Every structure is written in structure tokens, then in C-alpha cells.
């Protein structure tokens, strides 16, 4: 979870 949980910023 966190920024790494999203495909891109």
C-alpha cells in the first residue's frame, strides 16, 4: 500500500 500500490503518480 502507498505510492507503489498505484500504476503511476
Swiss-Prot record:
Expressed in the CNS and abdominal perisympathetic organs (aPSO). Not expressed in the ring gland, midgut or thoracic perisympathetic organs (tPSO) (at protein level). This is CAPA-Periviscerokinin-2. Its main location: secreted. Coiled coil: none annotated. GO terms for cellular component: extracellular region. It is found in: Secreted. The modification Leucine amide is found at residue 9. Belongs to the periviscerokinin family. The keyword Secreted applies. One of its GO terms (biological process) is neuropeptide signaling pathway. Keywords: Amidation, Neuropeptide, Secreted.
Amino acid at each position: 500500500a502507498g505510492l507503489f500500490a498505484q500504476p503511476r503518480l
